[in-house]
Amino acid sequence: MPPQAQILSDMVLANNHFTNEWPVPGCSSCLPGAHPSTIWTRATYFEGVLGLYRINHDPSIYNYAVQWGTFPNWSLRNGDTDTSPDDQGAGQEYIELYQFDTTQTNRLTHIVNNVNSWVKGNVGLKQWTYVDSIHMSMPAFAKLSVLDSNVISGLKTNYTYSPQMYSYFHFIKSVYGRSNGLYNATDHLWCRDTNFLSNYTASDGTKQKCYWSRGNGWAFAALARTMDVLPTNDLHYAEYLQTFQDMAAALKAVQRPDGFWNVNLGYTNDYPGPESSGTACFTYGMAWGINHGYLSSTTYLPTVINGWNALAIGALHHSSGADNGFLGYEQSTGSKPSDGQPVTYTSVPNFDDFGLGLFLLAGSQLYQLSASPGITLAAPVLTDNQVQLNFTVISSLTNATLELLQTGQLGTAWTTNTTAALTTNVAGISYCYTVTNIAPTGFYRIQSSP
């Protein structure tokens, strides 16, 4: 297992390479073709940025993210009635930034209005017709579903976000296309869209299955990000978890010996070679699953370590030149294995932000997993002023001091400590604690130590 200091160092190195190139986070000119800074690629980057901030608490990182949201006045790319799932990606990060400072309800206005317009029935189920939409949209619904309505009175109505979220998920998973969805319940992998339900022509000219790596990464990471905030008693939590666990097993089986995953999970000879963005998604999701006790550390920890080493050693540039911190092997935007080829150690993707965000997400979970003897977790507030803490002990110990940290407005903290008895001399055991009578909003984390 890489030490925490090295994991964090690699994350900071990669992020600094990006922020040095783009010091103004909200500008439109810092994206190809003058795209607005609320585009999904930049939103995905900030998913990882906030993951980095949660573990190093660097104010400059937080301020960089706030500047990004402030520039468009916390709006979505195409307005409050926008029907594109992609554009809800920015809203996910607005919600998280609100959770860091719950006095700033303006950060919620546009994403709440947008999701409300969906829930009211103005947006049909066919908006989720490509697997990317799960990642861009699903966590936004989940995050809104657990916010305290009293805190954002006047914004959130009585809409039930979780049931509507499931309606979209069920549609794309089990209905859309040929009436059985984009998810293959036998292979436990996803077709990116209906164009790939039939075998397609691979790069060697043969007809093969196409399970696009990053497309499956979108779904896998989205399930983790969704379950991370949903209460476990959510009506459909069990299905999300089962899908996640089935995918994990399928993904583990097709990892390359070098730790990467191919661009096509269904056929290794289709544009063979390493690819970073899908690898980062899978590494993130599996590490999250181990951290929360949903995946066996014995089974999946080697896969996670190999995935991270592929990214941090095989893809991340460590040099004395301008490329120091550049992440290689990243496929450009697209929808299939052929897009952005050739993908190499030095190839520059058309957007340099989203792959980095996924790398930072993976690092944020591996950092928690690498802690000894326990791990540090982010834990969202559930209903009734409770927070649920799930963690897996990595090393053998008999008890741990659990420190609950509330992170709200920057610079404030509230702590409480309790000692929990743990299974004697057994590593890899998962625990769940529920803490009650806490502040109704905010983000919490648990730190276990001897």
Regions found by a protein language model. Give the residues of each.
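CBM-like carbohydrate-recognition segments
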Residues: P2-F46, G51-G91, L97-H110, N114, ...
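Asp-box/WD-like beta-propeller blade repeats and closely related beta-sheet repeat scaffolds
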Residues: T105-P139
